[in-house]
């Protein structure tokens, strides 16, 4: 049940018309805990530091399957922070990580063969649920056969294939920086010089439309 009339079915329009963040108080008051927390703690202060989950993952002694998507706009980094926290603070635990070509929660509801026009060749979402998630739960909840999962199962979007890794980052890998350059170019190591007349490397942002 809606507690107040937004005045529009378009949530984006509601917040664009709202104006300053302080104006939201007349709608939300103190009844939305998460919103209140954000307003009361606008920086990474002691309140948020105490609630940073990875630091508390000590002595975990049960199987863990961490799942994320390369296209997750809400909390992509959290997957890797959780995995690193478990590997560091509970190194002997049965921990696995899976990252596929999905958006936020897409591994649980989508076919997974396409994302915004990008074809992946297989039904990655359905394959995950039937070949990874189900065997994992069967093994640990129903004493089924081993799920045979690697430490990290990662989908390579450029090659449209799954990679089984004994560690993450993989042993022998070298971190590189992908840097945006002028004219919409992307380079590895150092940004490419502008080649087109009038090309700009300054990012453009317009809240309306974003």
Please provide the spans of the model-predicted regions.
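Active-site-adjacent alpha-helix of alpha/beta-hydrolase-fold enzymes
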Residues: 76-95
């Amino acid at each position: 049940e809606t507690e107040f009339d937004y005045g529009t079915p378009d949530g984006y329009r509601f917040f664009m018309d709202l104006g300053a963040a302080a104006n939201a108080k007349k709608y939300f008051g103190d009844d939305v805990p998460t919103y209140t927390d954000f307003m009361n703690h606008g920086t990474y202060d002691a309140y948020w530091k105490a609630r940073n989950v990875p630091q508390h993952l000590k002595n975990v002694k049960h199987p863990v399957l961490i799942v994320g998507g390369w296209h997750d706009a809400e909390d992509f980094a959290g997957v890797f922070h959780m995995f690193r926290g478990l590997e560091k603070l509970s190194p002997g635990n049965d921990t696995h990580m899976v990252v596929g070509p999905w958006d936020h929660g897409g591994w649980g509801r989508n076919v997974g063969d396409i994302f915004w026009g990008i074809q992946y060749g297989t039904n990655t979402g359905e394959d995950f649920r039937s070949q990874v998630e189900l065997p994992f739960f069967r093994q640990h909840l129903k004493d089924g056969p081993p799920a045979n999962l690697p430490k990290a199962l990662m989908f390579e979007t450029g090659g449209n294939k799954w990679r089984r890794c004994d560690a993450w980052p993989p042993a022998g890998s070298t971190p590189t920086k992908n840097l945006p350059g002028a004219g919409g170019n992307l380079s590895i190591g150092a940004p490419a010089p502008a080649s087109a007349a009038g090309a700009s490397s300054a990012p453009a942002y317009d809240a309306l439309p974003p």
